[in-house]
Amino acid sequence: MILKKGAEADLYLEDFKDVFGFDFYNEKIVIKKRVKKNYRINEIDDMIRGFRTVKEAKIINKAKISGVYSPVLYLVDLKEKSIVMEYINGIRLKEHFSSKGLDKKIGFQIGKSVGSMHKAGIIHGDLTTSNMILSDGKVYFIDFGLSEESEEIEKQGIDVHLLRQALESTHFDISEELFKIIIEGYSDVVGNKKKDEILQRIEQIEKRGRYRKRD
């Protein structure tokens, strides 16, 4: 069953048994398959999709090792350019905050997880509440398709800046207080000095954005 069609990849929901030939606690799995681009030369397209598939799988695994809740990887299929992973059964934080309002405990969890990723040299690249799932009281991060490995303060600042923009766009009524709580969780992992550096960098990023709009 198709879950989502995207510009870069399609997501499918399947039974574990149908893919691997045996049952595993009635588990369901997600298959993320990168879309072939007909405008590219076949060999180049295969190389790009293969590289991005391996890169994403590697970063998901690195995030999990770093203590960030993320899907378990079952298989990386280079021939099909796909990742077979655990299906996280829960509610997206987009819906959770929309129905429950401000949730300080969850906000703090988000901050700690983002801090853990940055401390491990991971830039998620798409930190929205649509890419976070609440399951059994834990916040799982999904869709690492735009992620990369970097410890650059600029890229970390952009990561957090885009998260704040996503909160303001989707959860305007609680975004300011929620972002403060997220930053508290972030600081709990990376420390006050690093937290201050990130906030200063976000200010610089926002100033650059305002200057571009004037131009």
Each predicted region: which residue ranges?
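Conserved kinase catalytic-core helix
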Residues: K62, S66-V68, K94-S130, S135, ...
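Short hydrophobic-acidic sequence motifs that mark active-site Asp/Glu residues
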Residues: L13, K28-K32, V84, F141-D143, ...
